[in-house]
Amino acid sequence: MFPHVTIVEKPGCGNCVTLKRALKEKSVPHTVMPYVPGVPGSYPIATVGGQRVGYREITKALAMDMFTTSKCFKPFRYNWAEDIRTKHEKVHWVETEINLRDDVTDWKSGVMTPGEKAFVSCVLRLFTQLDVEVGALYLDHLTQVFRCNEIRNMLTSFACREAIHQKAYSLLNDTLGMPDCEYQAFADYGEMTDKLDFMREMDCSTLPGLARSLLRAVLNEGVSLFAAFVMLLTFQRSGKMKGMGKVVEWSVRDENIHVEGVSKLFETLNSEYPWVVTKDLIELFKEDAERVAELEEAFVDLAFQECGPVCGLEPKQVKDYVLYVINLRAANMGLPKLIERAPEACPIPWVKWLIDGADLTNFFENHVTEYETGGLTGSWSYEPLDI
């Protein structure tokens, strides 16, 4: 994972000896060049990927390696990863907590128009598979690279929740009476397969590739899924498909935590390897952001093509929301604007809560998961009853 390092050493330079030893111990490929009198700068002169890197930067990166297997459970090297994992588990839920009785009534009684049914079917056709791909990203790519135990625990916790998301949206499909063939129907739509192809394009074999993959992971979970969330939640505002809305609310809360964890992972990578995110890489980030915007616009057009505006939601609003969220997610990763034409304010005011992941459950009408398991601390004292 660590890129090839070229160092120019100087006779009698203690730091040169220390760096060469560290590179050898970490099995980092490196080339040692002979001293050339008259070359300015402090020694060793190190270059990584064609960029000159200071001695302190490179030794810090070697010491804070996220890619080395932990020798023991504690001490944690990355406390934030354990904190996020704990927060994630405290809002655990399972698909059996969802009540879809009213959704079936809405679907079969005529409350949902044929156009609205087509709209929901289009989104659900892809949604389960999207969560399959997100789970695969964690298990097949990120956990194969990050060997630090607390980071892996966070990532596997995220992957396990994606399995629950898959089951929840599958339960919705099955309860509404959609046949199993609907799970493969996405393959007939280029607007859907193109989105999935983009999600699968991950290269974690190099540090720049890993940084780009982390950005893509945030775009996948923090942008693409949220566009679909908006389209499904619009029915909840009209009192329709409330069970589906609850699945979305709980998924939103999870995905926000996932985005938080992956964004922090990106920031940590950038902090430990500050030479990785270059101007050229940021240009690639912008290309990825534009590609996501293009893919989402095509999918939005597909979803709306049979029904036009749904419950007051216009296609352009969703497209603008995608652009807005792309820049918002980028800012939270410490990156500049990736799309200049994006609106500065949220174009759909009623979905501002999505980014916070708040749960809007009515306590008296539904199960509640807006709680923290084990959240109470301190001691409990009471007087014995005089019976």
Curated annotation (Swiss-Prot):
UniProt keywords, alphabetically: Deoxyribonucleotide synthesis, Iron, Metal-binding, Oxidoreductase
InterPro entries: Ferritin-like_SF (IPR009078), RNR-like (IPR012348), RNR_small (IPR033909), RNR_small_fam (IPR000358)
Textual note on the cofactor: Binds 2 iron ions per subunit.
GO annotation terms (biological process): deoxyribonucleotide biosynthetic process
A GO term for molecular function: ribonucleoside-diphosphate reductase activity, thioredoxin disulfide as acceptor
Catalytic activity: a 2'-deoxyribonucleoside 5'-diphosphate + [thioredoxin]-disulfide + H2O = a ribonucleoside 5'-diphosphate + [thioredoxin]-dithiol
Chain sites annotated for binding Fe cation 2: E162, E221, E255, H258
Enzyme Commission number(s) of this protein: 1.17.4.1
Residue numbers binding Fe cation 1: D131, E162, H165
SUPFAM superfamilies: Ferritin-like
Active-site residues, as the UniProt record annotates them: Y169
Names of the cofactor(s): Fe cation
Pfam families named in the record: Ribonuc_red_sm
NCBIfam families attached to this UniProt entry: PRK09614.1-5 (NF007186)
Function: Ribonucleoside-diphosphate reductase holoenzyme provides the precursors necessary for viral DNA synthesis. Allows virus growth in non-dividing cells. Catalyzes the biosynthesis of deoxyribonucleotides from the corresponding ribonucleotides.
Complex formation: Heterotetramer composed of a homodimer of the large subunit (R1) and a homodimer of the small subunit (R2). Larger multisubunit protein complex are also active, composed of (R1)n(R2)n.
Family: Belongs to the ribonucleoside diphosphate reductase small chain family.
Protein name: Putative ribonucleoside-diphosphate reductase small subunit 067L
